[in-house]
Amino acid sequence: MSTTFPGLVHDAEIRHDGSNSYRLMQLGCLESVANSTVAYSSSSPLTYSTTGTEFASPYFSTNHQYTPLHHQSFHYEFQHSHPAVTPDAYSLNSLHHSQQYYQQIHHGEPTDFINLHNARALKSSCLDEQRRELGCLDAYRRHDLSLMSHGSQYGMHPDQRLLPGPSLGLAAAGADDLQGSVEAQCGLVLNGQGGVIRRGGTCVVNPTDLFCSVPGRLSLLSSTSKYKVTIAEVKRRLSPPECLNASLLGGILRRAKSKNGGRCLREKLDRLGLNLPAGRRKAANVTLLTSLVEGEALHLARDFGYTCETEFPAKAVGEHLARQHMEQKEQTARKKMILATKQICKEFQDLLSQDRSPLGSSRPTPILDLDIQRHLTHFSLITHGFGTPAICAALSTFQTVLSEMLNYLEKHTTHKNGGAADSGQGHANSEKAPLRKTSEAAVKEGKTEKTD
């Protein structure tokens, strides 16, 4: 009997409230009933053990229905022929009510089960469709599986397992309540910038929210600065082209190595809707820029541009290159080549200045065509935002060198023309001087003749 009604015997033996004799008398009646129905003891609904293949998965199609008819028919006939088995006859405590309701859910009426299962399957299909459109189906399927592993069996949400059932005189949880609970746990909405945000209950996760603060790798001890890492930046590190694993991501975020460090990081990312599977392999080659967060990479690019502008010897380099070709025949051709190079360099700079790759917490609207913008975005993601500003700084320095070359050539040409004009003028003055001397001598000779 203890194997057939474990919950009832345990409850009758441990309760000492003055009514043990009455309950034991009822249990005696139940024992006779159990002996007469020993053929059904192996399949009794109170001792039925579920297997992993007999409950409805939320990823089955909506037309898949599960109805354990042999258990339902026996449970229905047994309760109606023996009313002492009903929960009201024993007035069991709340824990026993929850156990009986769980058994009623397992062997309930087919219509309630089908409605709950259809609602769950319909909601799952809708969520899968949204996730495919957003490109993040894998990131959220782990969360759905975790819901199933924590008791969301038979199409039921875990929060609804211990709710009172229809046999206790209360309304059962409907499909609307089930859908609302699923939406509260793993709903997807879009923010104003078009990013994916995860809604869990009343908490809304925005891609621009702060994930953590990371100390800089390149700063000295006297000027250590921290850089903010947003959820969107972490998502970019987990997405192509890098697809970093837990070890590399933990190194970027400066997390100390621990026994459960990777698992804790994956759980935190999973709560935010980001998928980081265990044993993942990186997709891109690791460089020194891989270890930098985007804030520090931008800081490095700004310092590089400032150093190029203030410390690079652009004038000395430009004059040195211009002196290599100072022949009169080459000067005109060199000027034309320098002007053409400056024009091409300016066009390149204008193109890079229109790059709208996502960086930090910003996701600007693209200006360029998507065919060229996706390549610039790939380069920006690989360099963590350092590449494009660094190239712009180098191009600006190159423009300064070309300008110095052009100024030196123009100055040298003007100096030569001025020297030639001065030499011609001096030669004319030297020819006029002897004529003036001869005329003065002739005048003096005429004066002497007159005196004579």
UniProtKB/Swiss-Prot annotation:
Effect of residue 214 to F: In a breast cancer sample; somatic mutation
Residue positions, PTM Phosphoserine: 239
UniProt-listed GO biological process terms: inferior colliculus development; negative regulation of neuron apoptotic process; positive regulation of transcription by RNA polymerase II; regulation of cell population proliferation; transcription by RNA polymerase II
Example of a GO cellular component annotation carried by this entry: transcription regulator complex
Amino acid composition bias (Basic and acidic residues), ranges on this chain: 429-452
Disordered, as annotated region: 416-452
Pfam families: TF_AP-2 (PF03299)
Keywords, comma-separated and alphabetical: Activator, DNA-binding, Nucleus, Phosphoprotein, Transcription, Transcription regulation
Location of the region described as H-S-H (helix-span-helix), dimerization in the Swiss-Prot/TrEMBL record: 280-410
Cited InterPro entries: TF_AP2, TF_AP2_C
Subunit structure: Binds DNA as a dimer. Can form homodimers or heterodimers with other AP-2 family members.
Job description of the protein: Sequence-specific DNA-binding protein that interacts with inducible viral and cellular enhancer elements to regulate transcription of selected genes. AP-2 factors bind to the consensus sequence 5'-GCCNNNGGC-3' and activate genes involved in a large spectrum of important biological functions including proper eye, face, body wall, limb and neural tube development. They also suppress a number of genes including MCAM/MUC18, C/EBP alpha and MYC.
Family: Belongs to the AP-2 family.
Record's protein name: Transcription factor AP-2-delta
